[in-house]
Amino acid sequence: MIQSQTQLNVADNSGARKIMCIRIIGSSNRRYAHIGDIIVAVIKDAVPNMTLEKSEVVRAVIVRTRKELKRDNGIILRYDDNAAVIIDKEGNPKGTRIFGAIPRELRKLNFNKIVSLAPEVL
């Protein structure tokens, strides 16, 4: 469960290392975001000499959360960190590589480019 002011790791090579959620896209008063939700975030830590810089406002899709994800078949997934992938307005990732495992639910939400770049899909 990601809410406003939550810090997340960035799971791609776009140049950002840490982001902070400032808004959840969807309903106007939505409190929590889960895997597959799009958020508006600000970059808190970035790699020097890259396209994305600190204090830049970006959109990101959540790919891992520490809160459990329950599937219909009874499997429960929980990751070690909260992580997101930075995307553009069309939903394509800004980076060219994805780090770490990605849940299968992203394919149902039409983030096929992110799923194809991921090294492992759980």
Curated annotation (Swiss-Prot):
Primary location class: plastid
GO cellular component entries: cytosolic large ribosomal subunit; plastid
GO BP annotations listed: translation
Origin superkingdom: Eukaryota
Localization terms from the record: Plastid
Classification via SMART domains: Ribosomal_L14 (SM01374)
Signal peptide: none
Keywords: Plastid, Ribonucleoprotein, Ribosomal protein, RNA-binding, rRNA-binding
PROSITE patterns membership: RIBOSOMAL_L14
A Pfam family hit: Ribosomal_L14
GO MF term list: large ribosomal subunit rRNA binding; structural constituent of ribosome
Annotated InterPro entries: Ribosomal_uL14, Ribosomal_uL14_bac-type, Ribosomal_uL14_CS, Ribosomal_uL14_sf
Entry-linked PANTHER family: 50S/60S RIBOSOMAL PROTEIN L14/L23 (PTHR11761), LARGE RIBOSOMAL SUBUNIT PROTEIN UL14M (PTHR11761:SF3)
Subunit relationships: Part of the 50S ribosomal subunit.
Family in the record: Belongs to the universal ribosomal protein uL14 family.
UniProt function note: Binds to 23S rRNA.
Protein name as it appears in the record: Large ribosomal subunit protein uL14c
Native organism: Cuscuta gronovii (Common dodder)
